[in-house]
Amino acid sequence: MTAARTPLHARTVPLDYGPDALEFDGSPTVLFDRPGLTLVGWGTALLVPARDAAAALAAIPCDDAVNVLGSGPVALGALPFTDAFDGHVVVPRFTMGTSRDADGVTRRWATAVGPADIALPDTGELFDAVIWQYGTTPAEPAPAASAADLTTAMDSAGYAAMVADAVRAMAQPEATLRKVVLSRPVEVHLGGALSLAAALRRLRAGEPNCTIFSMPVPAGTFFGASPELLVARHGTKVSSHPLAGTVPRGDTARTDADAQRDLAGSTKNRAEHRYVVDAIAAGLGPFCEELSVPTEPSVVAFRSVAHLGTRLEGRLGARPVGVLELLRPLHPTPAVGGTPRPEALSFIAGHEAGERGHWAGPVGWVGAGGDGEWMIGIRSAQLDANGTTLRLRAGGGVVADSDPDAEAAEANVKLATVLDAVVPGASVQLR
């Protein structure tokens, strides 16, 4: 028998000023920070399985004096790669939001969620409650933790061998597998406790065009800098921006331009990318009365790598559909699983070292009206509850003409991107 939840209510008020959440002396409970929108929450008003989030939010009446994207009660979380909707999301006790539109207009607000029989604070009280309960002192620059030991259940040579196995499997006459995304894990034991807020600041400084996130998961915190939008719903507008097909950035302007030009013209990378675009279009199509799917990808460059990317945009039909319902048929896309999905997931289960956990699972937020944004949880790490052990994973898409050594090198570049942002210099231990 499931105990009835305590009835909740919520209040959202405008703010004239909002401090940077990453400058507090303590880490927030949840963080979703992309160019144009920041949601940061403290405390837990409700912890609910993702499959029940829409109904739980709809049951929270809210006095919302702001009424913009992300205001009102929201649920945020990181969902596991496998059985994503069994994962949990958090409705924070206090949420501070900032939005910046295309015209440069900034809106700030705070939302409180609490038991329905207890009065919620007004504007000044709400702001003070957040500041005084969760930290008032700007964080001092924290010394970076050192990597005392780096271990892995699969080194680069083992990863290359796994890629070679996949290529051979695709070459069999009866093979139906066309693409599989493979990854390898790394575990870092730190010489001292990691300052999560400092690590997030370094990630944001290094990848300003990514979504910086930090979410509680069982036995720790899952955080990172995701470059890839799985799905967003803003009113009737739907969008997705998959990335697939990758090259390392060049060391000079010329070599970088050459690498990006080669990526744009690569038959192998374009085919790998198209599998993802077609799968997302097929998943979103039944919900949309209009869906724009560009025929040509663009090159999207980040600090260490460049990807092929395609932005899909659509308009929902008459039936109301929340972002979590849109998410369900999409995950895992061929960008993190493969195609056909059953064959790819079977190969992953039989060949990868260890469980993926939350790596490459959906990370994001959903509001009471069904709006929300979900990224793919790559370029990420999980920090244990003591703050002394990091677990990372990275990899890439494998198709019939993939080169195992090149794929192993690409995986190392992706691992190093996160490692060196979180624990500067740790990537020298990668093997």
Predicted regions and their residues:
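Soluble sensory domains of the PAS superfamily and closely related sensory modules
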Residues: 25, 66-69, 204-208, 352
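Contiguous alpha-helical scaffold segments within structured protein domains
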Residues: 1-15, 34-52, 101, 116-157, ...
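Cofactor- and metal-binding active-site motifs of prokaryotic enzymes
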Residues: 2-137, 156, 216-230, 371, ...
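A short glycine-rich, hydrophobically flanked beta-strand micro-motif that places a catalytic Asp/Glu
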Residues: 28-30, 76-79, 180, 212-215, ...
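Conserved hydrophobic core element of enzyme catalytic domains
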Residues: 311-431
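An anion-binding catalytic pocket shared by soluble metabolic enzymes
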Residues: 35-49, 83-94, 103-104, 184-271, ...
